[in-house]
């Protein structure tokens, strides 16, 4: 009984353990089959160690491992590799390649691959448009030079038609015919239309004299530009050139803003000693550049900005037109001209025939002094007749030679011309030598002290200093002096031309010329003369007025809503 029970329990345990083993075996077989089947038909995982070797080579691993790419991927990689190598020769394939080497199955252009980025294509395109590479040096090998089209027919041989037919070339005439023929597509010195040079620009009529091409900068323009043009032209003396009184130590005013230690005195408080002062020309106005009214007002009576600013200039000196070269001779090589500052002083000099443009007048011994020596005997006795060598003048200096104005001591004309400040840069050190004297200029370079016959034409509205009474006259109304006239081609034209803007009538001409220009209509308004560049303090008080339509043409310029608004206002005023 016991044995039977024991055997039965043992058999049950055997069945139980055997079933567990069978279950474990079944689970293991299922897992193994899953692992086996999972390896079929797919590539290996990216994190396997040897995957990098298989990637890019196009070849799978050893036959022991079933992890090589499918046929589709392998064929694509071979095709892409071949296509990439072929793309390196653009003149054979013409393929525009992306900027990355194709390796995996992916869209041709992605965020990492953009179009037209092949360097060979860029080089080929640059050569095509620039033509900057020779045939033998072309990087892409595709550049071809641009060639001008040849003539369709050759030159007709010389001959004559007779009753017997056409006779050939006469002996000896072939070379002459070739020399007279220009086998070209272009004509020399032939323009399609005739050039007509008019005016300085828009809004100015053709009756205004113009020289030197279109929009050239060395011509006189109307006052409606601003009075700066009047005071910057060649042929003007520096205002204040004959002002006397005061000592050098006291007159160093310059500008209170930029030189706070300067002693500033009114004209009435300056000592009465007369200081030698010659004719100060525009070409010598260098040194301290005048600064306009900026900030604090200097403590000087009637100060109006740059009009009273002091600028360092030469003392009793006048440098000649030899482009900064000193004159030859013993002792002081810079002759003192008109040392006492008298209006009719002696000792000035002229240049012979400076208005001529011939080489004879540009070179050689042309300078000489004139008139007897002055009272002080500074100039040599018996007048100065020593010739001087004048270097060849530049084109710009020749342009200035057509103006005839002279310093206060000039007794004959023409005198040596002055320079335009813009054409004489500060780097000319000889022009800046000996600038140890301060003087008080006016608003610009209009000479208020020399008579009009010596070139002082234009506006004269600055106070002058009376050296005898030691007083400053009060400013008067603006006075137009007569325009300088003469038979010379003063402004470079072929006819007698007065100063275009030297009188009110000429200014009215400019006003009429600009009348049809609706944008420049208010430019020539005479009220603007009260706020010109010579009176910067008045410019501070200038109140611009709004443009008001006062005729039908002006109304047409306005939009429809503005016209209705103005009409409503007009009707409202009429009802009142």
From Swiss-Prot:
Sorted UniProt keywords: Capsid protein, Late protein, Virion
Start and end residues of each stretch annotated as Disordered: 322-348
Disulfide bonds: none
Record's keyword annotation contains Zinc: no
InterPro entries the UniProt entry points to: P2_DUF5899 (IPR045418)
Superkingdom of the organism of origin: Viruses
Conditions for induction: Expressed in the early-late phase of the viral replicative cycle.
Comment block on domains: The hydrophobic region might anchor the protein in the underlying inner membrane.
Protein name: Minor capsid protein P2
UniProt organism field: Paramecium bursaria Chlorella virus 1
Gene: A342L
């Amino acid at each position: 009984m016991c044995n039977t029970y024991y055997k039965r329990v043992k058999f049950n345990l055997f069945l139980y353990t055997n079933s567990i083993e069978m279950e474990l075996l079944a689970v293991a077989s299922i897992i193994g089959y899953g692992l086996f089947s999972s390896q079929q038909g797919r590539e290996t995982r990216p994190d396997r160690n040897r995957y990098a070797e298989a990637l890019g080579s196009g070849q799978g691993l050893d036959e022991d491992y079933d992890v090589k790419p499918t046929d589709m991927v392998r064929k694509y990689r071979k095709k892409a590799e071949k296509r990439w190598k072929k793309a390196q020769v653009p003149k054979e394939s013409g393929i525009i390649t992306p900027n990355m080497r194709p390796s995996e199955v992916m869209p041709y252009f992605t965020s990492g691959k953009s179009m037209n980025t092949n360097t060979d294509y860029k080089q080929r395109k640059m050569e095509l448009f620039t033509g900057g590479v020779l045939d033998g040096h072309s990087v892409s090998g595709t550049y071809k030079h641009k060639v001008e089209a040849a003539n369709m027919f050759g030159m007709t041989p010389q001959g004559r038609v007779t009753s017997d037919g056409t006779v050939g070339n006469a002996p000896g005439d072939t070379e002459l015919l070739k020399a007279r023929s220009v086998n070209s597509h272009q004509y020399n010195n032939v323009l399609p239309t005739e050039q007509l040079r008019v005016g300085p620009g828009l809004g100015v009529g053709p009756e205004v004299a113009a020289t030197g091409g279109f929009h050239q900068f060395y011509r006189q323009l109307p006052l409606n530009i601003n009075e700066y043009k009047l005071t910057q032209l060649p042929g003007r003396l520096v205002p204040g050139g004959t002002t006397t009184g005061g000592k050098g130590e006291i007159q160093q005013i310059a500008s209170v803003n930029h030189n706070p230690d300067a002693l500033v005195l009114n004209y009435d408080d300056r000592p009465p000693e007369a200081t030698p002062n010659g004719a100060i020309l525009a070409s010598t106005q260098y040194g301290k550049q005048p600064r306009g009214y900026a900030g604090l007002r200097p403590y000087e009576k009637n100060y109006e900005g740059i009009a009273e600013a002091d600028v360092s200039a030469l003392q009793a000196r006048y440098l000649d037109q030899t482009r900064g070269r000193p004159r030859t001779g013993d002792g002081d090589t810079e002759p003192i001209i008109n040392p006492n500052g008298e209006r009719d002083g002696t000792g000035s000099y002229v240049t012979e025939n400076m208005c001529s443009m011939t080489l004879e007048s540009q070179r050689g011994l042309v300078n000489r002094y004139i008139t007897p020596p002055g009272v002080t005997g500074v100039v040599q006795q018996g007048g100065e007749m020593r010739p001087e060598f004048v270097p060849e003048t530049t084109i710009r200096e020749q342009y200035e030679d057509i103006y005839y104005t002279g310093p206060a001591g000039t007794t004959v004309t023409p005198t040596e011309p002055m320079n335009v400040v813009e054409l004489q840069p500060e780097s000319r050190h000889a022009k800046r030598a000996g600038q140890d004297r301060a003087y008080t200029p006016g608003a610009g370079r209009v000479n208020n002290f020399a008579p009009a016959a010596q070139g002082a034409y234009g506006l004269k509205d600055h106070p002058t200093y009376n050296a005898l009474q030691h007083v400053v006259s009060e400013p008067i109304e603006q006075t137009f002096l007569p325009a300088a006239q003469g038979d010379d081609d003063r402004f470079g034209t072929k006819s007698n031309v007065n100063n275009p803007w030297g009188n009110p009538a000429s200014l009215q001409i400019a006003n009429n010329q600009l009348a049809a220009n609706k944008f420049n209509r208010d430019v020539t308004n005479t009220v603007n003369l009260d706020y010109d560049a010579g009176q910067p303090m008045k410019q501070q008080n200038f109140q611009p007025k709004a443009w008001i339509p006062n005729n039908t043409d002006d109304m047409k310029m306005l939009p429809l809503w503005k016209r209705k608004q103005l009409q409503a206002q007009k009707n409202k005023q009429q009802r009142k």
